[in-house]
Swiss-Prot record:
It comes from the Eukaryota. This is Semaphorin-4C. Disruption phenotype: Partial neonate lethality, due to defects in brain and neural tube development. In about one third of the embryos cranial neural folds fail to converge, leading to an open neural tube and exencephaly. Mice without exencephaly are viable and fertile. It comes from Mus musculus. Residues 30-497 form the Sema domain. The lineage of its organism: Eukaryota, Metazoa, Chordata, Craniata, Vertebrata. Belongs to the semaphorin family.
Length: 834
């Protein structure tokens, strides 16, 4: 058994040969497991009307998983994903109406999205939701799992207004540390502290403090524990923002890490109720040799060790390289981040009009540092006692000169044409005594990648399709129960970290190099390492590259496959499939006792797409036994075995199959196809009959319809009509006789004529649309009467010469128009639509 340090020596040698990039650039997972193959090993939860399982909070001591979704909260048992409780917390209808009136979508935004859910104390949870763009917070009783609806708190600064905006938060000793956007428009980014014994404190609204950030994660590190300098605990925030220090490109986005001290009280005069310990630095994740820089930080996971000194951060990044999407995972050590925050500052030079390293003397006490033993010895027991020169300096210099670089100086792995969304990590002890870090990475198309860190490179164990074309929105891992939870838009899933049953053979189990799995010699099964710890009965070697003898040295029998009998006609092109054990294996064929070359023109050809050996124009000399081995890292695993017999006859093309292997499926497909054809035939006949009936009805209706020419009765000669004051409102009601554009409606019927003299009085004005007093009605400007059967009469202005009686002129013009109008095919032709 090779020692663990041998991995590092081998990696260094490979890197010197220039092939190290193959161990982290676009790695291929060894196994691909589709969603159909996960049916028996994955538990799922979904509920009608419930969406966006965004917030997952695990409490190991109680064995419960708390889930925040859209307008709902759930409690599940960690072991079996059994529902323990559910709460409906919807935004009121009036809040949703206000949200839509402000221009937000009532389909995707105007709901109560749960964005913060964490334990407040031993008996209550603290929960915050967007509440239709009016954030609210309240408490949940953990014992009864009920929501306190009597005391909703304002969620401003604790939860984002917009569910699509980045947010992160922590509850530490009853104090809420939150990074979010502090207003409806999302223009006030803030990192603040609420609740608890201290008063509220937040960042300055300055572009060089926070500039359009997208917050993705936060972490509490108890650095006061065991500190020889009396240091304070710290809270770290991770985000992307538009960089201010690059004058060449103002739109440059970079990844950041910022930190504040838990005991920060703000300044006495300068920076009152503002952070005095806020510092930030750039997170670098790049492949300089390929000129690829990952600046879009998407998620961060904090992996804690036995001591806070061993804290590790894993970041998920995205980038665009030409026309290709790239994703990467970078690893950062807490010690590296601390060194950057203790280094030089960056400042904006007014004279040079650019950002540069600050080279002048730094004030004392050091700006941005936490209160420690040195401060106390010099009379500074609180940030309220810090001098103004220190506070003014940190107000103008929150950005550090040095950058936080990843371990190894490059990404752990890079994947092309993939968007990573989330990552979680676990430390697993191997049977060789080493501890391995296993990463679980969610993707934008619903896959979960499982990878193990082997010193300077990564081994991709497998890829699992946990969701069908839905992004992995959230991930959380239970180290005590060894299960993983993943949330998407429509469902929540639980899967075991140690799914070892898929490996049926010793070689396959060992080659998986999965720290959770080992081969049990006694039971001849691949089992989880937690089920048995006796090294003499379990076979596992994660770091060893040469596993060819691992199974043989324990006397494990090789797997033998039963040959399939194939009889073909001479001259036939024969296709012999070979199902490989993994994506990293390649096929090795033998004929008789001889190895077959990868390609022999005119005789043998291996088709990588079909993963099959093609025997072209088989002859009698091709009769005999064929064996296919799945070869991986020098180890051969029997995959397929065929016994071929070539007989004389006409030439056809055959593919090797087991006898009657899929005959039942063929008959089932034939019956199903016949049923579909019958249903389609009946549907066509039914539609044809309906169409014929409709045509007959239309013909009968047209025969019964008579078209009568419409004639307007002639008006008797009478004096001009002068409406009286009593009937003026009725006859000139603007609602009944005017269109919205001022046109007059002409409705069939006879108005009551009353004697009177003089021109008619003008109608009352329409609000917002004053009309001139009409003295003439013009039909020429009306809409096309042939289009809809209506005649629109415009009200004229002043009389264009001459006086006369308008009603006879109206009757003549209207009669001409009606005679020209085409009759409409109406069911009741006596009823005019003029």
């Amino acid at each position: 058994m090779a020692p663990h340090w041998a991995v590092w020596l081998l990696a260094a040698g490979l890197w010197g040969l220039g092939i190290g990039a193959e161990m982290w650039w676009n790695l291929v997972p060894r196994k691909t497991v589709s969603s159909g193959e996960l049916v028996t090993v994955v538990r799922r939860f979904s509920q009608t009307g419930i969406q966006d399982f965004l917030t997952l909070t695990l409490t190991e001591h109680s064995g419960l998983l708390y889930v925040g979704a859209r307008e709902a909260l759930f409690a599940f048992s960690v072991e079996a994903l059994e529902l323990q409780g559910a709460i409906s917390w919807e935004a009121p209808a009036e809040k949703k109406i206000e949200c839509t009136q402000k221009g937000k979508s009532n389909q995707t935004e105007c709901f109560n999205f749960i964005r913060f859910l964490q334990p407040y104390n031993s008996s209550h949870l603290y929960v915050c939701g967007t509440y239709a763009f009016q954030p609210k917070c309240t408490y949940i009783n953990m014992l009864t799992f009920t929501l306190d609806r009597a005391e909703f708190e304002d969620g401003k600064g604790k939860c984002p207004y917009d569910p699509a905006k980045g947010h992160t938060g922590l509850l530490v000793d009853g104090e809420l540390y939150s990074a979010t956007l502090n207003n409806f428009l999302g223009t006030e980014p803030v990192i603040l502290r609420y609740m608890g014994t201290h008063h509220s404190i937040k960042t300055e609204y300055l572009a060089f403090w926070l500039n359009e950030p997208h917050f993705v994660g936060s972490a509490f590190v108890p650095e006061s524990v065991g500190s020889f300098t009396g240091d304070d605990d710290k809270i770290y925030f991770f985000f992307s923002e538009r960089a201010v220090e690059y004058d060449c490109y103002s739109e440059q986005v970079v990844a950041r890490v910022a930190r504040v001290c838990k005991g920060d009280m703000g300044g006495a005069r300068t920076l009152q109720k503002k952070w005095t310990t806020f510092l930030k630095a750039r997170l670098v994740c790049s492949a300089p040799d390929w000129k690829v820089y990952f600046n879009q930080l998407k998620a961060v996971h904090t992996l804690r060790g036995a001591s806070w000194h061993n804290t590790t951060f894993f970041g998920v990044f995205q980038a665009r390289w030409g026309d290709m999407d790239l994703s990467a995972v970078c690893e950062y050590q807490l010690e590296q981040i601390q060194q950057v925050f203790e280094g030089p500052y960056k400042e904006y030079s007014e004279q040079a009009q650019k950002w540069a390293r600050y080279t002048d003397p730094v004030p004392s006490p050091r700006p941005g540092s936490c209160i420690n033993n040195w401060h106390r010895d010099n009379g500074y027991t609180s940030s309220l006692e810090l001098p103004d020169n220190t506070l003014n300096f940190i107000k103008k210099h929150p950005l550090m000169e040095d950058q936080v670089k990843p371990r190894l100086g490059r990404p752990l792995l890079v994947k092309k044409n993939t968007n990573f969304t989330h990552v979680v990590a676990d430390r697993v002890p191997g049977l060789d005594g080493a501890t391995y870090t296993v990463l679980f990475i969610g993707t934008g198309d619903g896959w979960l990648l499982k990878a193990v860190s082997l010193g300077p490179w990564i081994h991709m164990v497998e890829e699992l399709q946990v969701f069908d074309q839905e992004p992995v929105e959230s991930l959380v891992l239970s180290q005590s129960k060894k299960v993983l939870f993943a949330g998407s838009r429509s469902q929540l899933v639980q899967l075991s970290l140690a799914d070892c049953t898929k490996y049926r053979f010793c070689v396959d189990c060992v080659l998986a190099r999965d720290p959770y799995c080992a081969w049990n010699v006694n039971t001849s099964r691949c089992v989880a390492t937690t089920s048995g710890r006796s090294g003499s009965f379990l076979v596992q070697h994660v770091a060893n590259l040469d596993t060819s003898k691992m199974c043989n040295q324990y006397g494990i029998k090789k797997v033998r496959s039963i040959p399939k009998n194939i009889t073909v006609v001479s001259g036939t092109d024969l296709v012999l499939p070979c199902h490989l054990s993994s994506n990293l294996a390649h096929a090795h064929w033998t004929f008789g006792s001889q190895d077959l070359p990868a390609e022999q023109p005119g005789s043998f050809l291996y088709d990588t797409g079909l993963q099959a050996l093609v025997v072209m124009a088989a002859q009698s000399r091709h009769s005999g036994p064929y064996r296919c081995y799945s070869e991986e890292q020098g180890t051969r695993l029997a995959a397929e075995s065929y016994l071929v017999a070539v007989v004389a006859g006409s030439s056809v093309t055959l593919e090797a199959r087991a006898p009657l292997e899929n005959l039942g499926l063929v008959w089932l497909a034939v019956v199903a196809l016949g049923a579909v054809c019958l249903v389609l035939l009946l549907l066509v006949l039914s539609l044809r009959r309906r169409l014929r009936e409709e045509l007959e009805k239309g013909a009968k209706a047209s025969e019964r319809t008579l078209v009568y020419p419409l004639e307007l009765p002639k008006e008797p000669a009478s004096p001009p009509f002068r409406p009286g004051p009593e009937t003026d409102e009725k006859l000139w009601d603007p609602v009944g006789y005017y269109y919205s554009d001022g046109s007059l409606k002409i409705v069939p019927g006879h108005a009551r004529c009353q004697p009177g003299g003089g021109p008619p009085s003008p109608p009352p004005g329409i609000p917002g649309q004053p009309l001139p007093s009409p003295t003439r009605l013009h039909l020429g400007g009306g809409r096309n009467s042939n289009a809809n059967g209506y005649v629109r009469l415009q009200l004229g202005g002043e009389d264009r010469g001459g006086s006369g009686h308008p009603l006879p002129e109206l009757a003549d013009e209207l009669r001409r128009k009606l005679q020209q109008r085409q009759p409409l095919p109406d069911s009741n032709p006596e009823e005019s639509s003029v």
